[in-house]
């Protein structure tokens, strides 16, 4: 055979071999090497998650689960593990984990009573979300004990510690007048909540009479259209107000029967705080002249409980005000926008966010978005970071103590993130997110069922 023909045959063979190899890969492509790397343990978790996600209650929802081992390797990620979803209150873990690292567990909020050089007595807020009416009474007593007898000027509130508006632009209008949507001010009091009482009518559909609010917002006009609902129908009231406003609208229903109370947000907490403080001072004999004059400086300071204890409570009841005040304080201390400061903290800890929308510190904004993968990585970084053991302890226990986690929930959204302890003592970090969830079933019971099954499959 001539050399030319031999060469041609060899080339033909190579081309044919290359075509069949390409065709085989096209039909059976190799798994991608970018993104999340699934460890060999994924198959049992895949089956567990798919069986769970196929339940009729979840068939219309977007569901995702991510599991990380103690080294941060991805043990399992469901199909939506790298898709940004609404986190609800699990977003609080970005705030609280960063707070442990940036502020420290012993950080305390300070509220001061200062007699200024213009003669005014100033209640200077430090953003303490836990300041109470009893704390204001104690501030008054301390100031009187320090010799305060007369104020040449007036009593004023200084809330300038936070530059951000007290109510986030992304919070729902229907949330901000209700207790869980209370704004975050430099001067807060009683968690910025009031108890609003109504007297139902004799028949369903009758107007319900507005009785009182406690504490009573000063100089406030109430526009009440609440009516009487069926007996046992519960709290159907929504309150509408604006920060610093003097008009509160109440709509909805209260159940027929005895007087019924609902919780609402104070529209002007600094005004309520100064009114209460002035009353306490006047009861102690302090006179207010209301004229320019001289002051004597700082008279009293109230310090909050340590931050770690506030975070314990914040996680336990998912307190939006406490989370937002901590978030804004991180920004104040760092000298940056709070979202930038919190994000930067986690990025320095090795969390590479994709698709993150961090609009508040509490998760109340529905426009917040985070990938389940990133939510899990934040929690692992928090456990590994400064005071990680204290952070772990602050999360709510369940499943016989084998789970430590922060839950999140709002209409259509259920989420969960934290740590799952296996029978061999290893600890997985997890993030479970469900968006588009319906009503009429116990999601948290299903959540417990899933985590118990994951724990069993890990052995």
Give the location of each predicted region.
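Short active-site loop at a secondary-structure junction
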Residues: 78-98, 102, 311
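Small-residue-rich helix-loop
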Residues: 75-78, 302, 317, 324-459
């Amino acid at each position: 055979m001539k050399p030319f023909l031999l060469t041609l045959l060899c080339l033909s063979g190579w081309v044919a071999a290359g075509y069949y190899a390409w065709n085989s890969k096209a039909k059976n492509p190799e798994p991608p090497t970018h993104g999340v790397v699934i460890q060999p343990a994924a198959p049992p978790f895949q089956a567990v998650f798919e069986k769970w996600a196929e339940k009729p209650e979840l068939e219309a929802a977007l569901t995702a689960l991510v599991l990380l081992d103690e080294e941060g390797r991805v043990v399992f990620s469901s199909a939506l593990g790298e898709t940004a979803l609404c986190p609800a209150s699990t977003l609080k873990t970005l705030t609280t984990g960063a707070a442990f690292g940036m502020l420290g567990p012993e950080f305390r909020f300070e509220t001061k009573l200062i007699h200024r050089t213009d003669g005014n007595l100033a209640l200077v807020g430090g953003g303490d979300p836990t300041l109470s009416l009893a704390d204001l009474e104690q501030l008054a007593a301390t100031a009187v004990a320090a010799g305060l007898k007369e104020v040449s000027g007036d009593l004023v509130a200084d809330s300038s510690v936070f530059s951000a508006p007290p109510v986030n632009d992304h919070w729902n209008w229907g949330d901000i007048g209700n207790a869980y949507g209370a704004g975050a001010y430099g001067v807060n009091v009683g968690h910025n909540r009031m108890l609003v009482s109504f007297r139902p009518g004799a028949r369903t559909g009758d107007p319900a009479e507005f009785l009182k609010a406690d504490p009573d917002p000063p100089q406030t006009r109430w526009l009440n259209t609440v009516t009487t609902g069926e007996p046992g129908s519960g709290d159907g009231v929504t309150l509408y107000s604006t920060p610093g406003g003097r008009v509160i609208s109440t709509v909805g229903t209260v159940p027929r029967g005895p007087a019924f109370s609902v919780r609402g947000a104070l529209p002007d907490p600094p005004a309520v705080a100064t009114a209460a403080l002035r009353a306490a001072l006047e009861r102690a004999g302090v006179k207010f002249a209301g004229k320019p004059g001289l002051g004597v400086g700082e008279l009293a300071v109230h310090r909050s409980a340590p931050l770690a204890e506030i975070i314990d409570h914040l996680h336990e009841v998912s307190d939006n005000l406490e989370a937002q005040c901590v978030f804004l304080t991180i920004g104040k201390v760092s000298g940056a926008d709070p979202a930038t400061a919190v994000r930067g903290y986690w990025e320095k800890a090795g969390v590479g966010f994709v698709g993150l929308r961090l609009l508040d510190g509490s998760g109340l904004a529905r426009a917040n978005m985070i990938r389940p993968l990133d939510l899990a990585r934040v929690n692992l970084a928090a456990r590994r970071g400064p005071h990680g053991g204290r952070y772990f302890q602050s999360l709510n226990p369940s499943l016989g103590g084998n789970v430590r986690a922060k839950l999140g929930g709002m209409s259509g959204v259920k989420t969960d993130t934290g740590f799952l302890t296996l029978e061999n003592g290893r600890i997985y970090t997890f993030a479970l997110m469900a968006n588009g969830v319906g009503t009429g079933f116990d999601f948290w019971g299903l959540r417990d069922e899933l985590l118990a099954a994951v724990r069993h499959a890990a052995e």
